[in-house]
Swiss-Prot record:
One of its GO terms (biological process) is phospholipid biosynthetic process. It catalyses: an acyl phosphate + sn-glycerol 3-phosphate = a 1-acyl-sn-glycero-3-phosphate + phosphate. Its EC number is 2.3.1.275. Catalyzes the transfer of an acyl group from acyl-phosphate (acyl-PO(4)) to glycerol-3-phosphate (G3P) to form lysophosphatidic acid (LPA). This enzyme utilizes acyl-phosphate as fatty acyl donor, but not acyl-CoA or acyl-ACP. This is Glycerol-3-phosphate acyltransferase. It is found in: Cell membrane. It comes from Wolbachia pipientis wMel.
């Protein structure tokens, strides 16, 4: 029974729309900014770096804490821990409170990676930074970092591979419009 409570809690934690909450407190309607997405990247488009950093931290933290709680209460049963990670991302992407219209899951995925392993986290962050600095597209950086984390897990952390493959597929699914925009040269670019 305890394991099922942890799984439900993972979805609920993931579904807390921190970016939307913190921007509303500042009088900003995130749905009317940039892409209209409720993730940390769109908070950055408001021009408020502090809010963007806070959104990134909080969205990552909920992924981390969901996995951490599962690790503590699921007797190191990998199945429940991995499902809790997926549910945290699903909660972020499809929050019940917002008619299942949420963010793209990248920051939450980062938090999950931190909970699992620092090596794969560093790979994710380094790839994200390199691609972002080279091309100035957050979406391309996110997709590249996610793909690299999935590939890394296949070669070096096989126990995480299926979980990260599922999360990666979800991240790509939520970025479908960005992928089309990238291919058409219409994607939003961050300038210095």
């Amino acid at each position: 029974m305890e394991k099922y409570v942890v799984l439900i809690l993972s979805y609920i934690l993931g579904s807390i729309p921190f970016s939307l909450i913190i921007t509303r407190i500042k009088g900003i309607n995130l749905r009317e900014v940039g892409s209209g997405n409720i993730g940390a990247t769109n908070v950055a488009r408001t021009g408020n770096k502090f809010l963007a950093a806070l959104a990134l931290f909080l969205d990552s933290f909920k992924g981390f804490i969901a996995v951490y709680i599962a690790q503590q209460f699921c007797d190191n049963n990998d199945f429940y821990i991995y499902v809790s990670a997926i549910l945290a991302v699903l909660g972020h992407m499809f929050p019940i409170w917002l008619k299942f219209s949420g963010g793209k899951g990248v920051a939450t995925t980062l938090g999950i990676l931190i909970a699992f392993n620092i090596d794969i986290t560093l790979v994710f962050v380094i790839i994200w930074i390199i691609v972002f600095l080279a091309f100035r597209y957050s979406s391309l950086a996110s997709l590249s970092a996610t793909s690299t984390a999935v590939a890394w897990s296949f070669f070096f952390q096989r126990n995480l591979f299926l979980t990260l493959l599922i999360i990666g597929a979800l991240v790509f699914l939520k970025h479908h419009r960005n992928i089309v925009n990238l291919l058409q040269g219409k994607e939003y670019k961050f300038y210095r």
